[in-house]
UniProtKB/Swiss-Prot annotation:
The lineage of its organism: Bacteria, Pseudomonadati, Pseudomonadota, Gammaproteobacteria, Alteromonadales. Its EC number is 3.5.1.88. It catalyses: N-terminal N-formyl-L-methionyl-[peptide] + H2O = N-terminal L-methionyl-[peptide] + formate. It comes from Shewanella oneidensis (strain ATCC 700550 / JCM 31522 / CIP 106686 / LMG 19005 / NCIMB 14063 / MR-1). The gene is def2. This is Peptide deformylase 2. InterPro entries: Peptide_deformylase, Peptide_deformylase_sf. GO terms for biological process: co-translational protein modification; translation.
């Protein structure tokens, strides 16, 4: 049913799931078919992200169980200081390495509308993912771009920003005011 709906409405924004919806608690499933349906989903996700003024969006946020997200950092009213990057479709992502250097930053989430959270995350990560053609890519990401990747990766693990903000390490770092070495 979901595939049929996408074929009928390419590039049409999809409804965004909000905290409390079951899809946001589920672990995403590996993408195995790199076909037009996947490309259409990515296109619709991008349209949803742009319409909502986001810098990233994960498939579970548009009610799809697939391990897929899009990052497209650009300055906008939600993130006026965001660096500009070309949209990047990330399929079946893995975080291979996380730096010990942590940094805190304000994050919002399209699935937790109207709220911002201070979140500590590794400043640099090394990642591996597939593109829309199924080819494996490797990248080292830093700063805000690394933050977007980790935020969207959380969605694929069934973790929303609300849950991330309540994790013990986040509370400890907030109390201390700095990461523990």
């Amino acid at each position: 049913m979901f595939k049929d709906e996408m074929r009928q409405t390419p590039n049409k924004p999809l409804p965004i799931a909000v905290v409390g919806e079951a899809i946001l608690k589920q672990q995403a499933i590996e993408v195995r078919d790199f076909d037009d349906t996947l490309s259409q989903l990515a296109s619709q996700m991008a349209a949803s992200m742009v319409e909502a003024k986001g810098v990233g969006i994960a498939a579970p946020q548009v009610h799809s169980p697939l391990a897929l997200f899009i990052m497209a950092s650009r300055p906008n009213e939600r993130y006026p200081d965001a660096p500009l990057m070309e949209p990047l479709v990330v399929v079946n992502p893995q975080i291979v390495l996380r730096s010990l250097q942590l940094e805190k930053g304000e994050e919002g989430c399209l699935s937790v509308p109207g709220q911002r959270f201070t979140i500590w995350r590794p400043q640099t990560i090394v990642v591996r993912y597939q593109n829309l053609a199924g080819q494996w890519q490797h990248s080292e990401l830093t700063g805000f771009i690394a933050r977007i990747f980790q935020h969207e990766f959380d969605h694929l693990q069934g973790i929303t920003l609300l849950e991330r903000s309540q994790m013990p390490e986040q509370k400890l770092m907030a109390q201390e005011g700095k990461p523990q070495a």
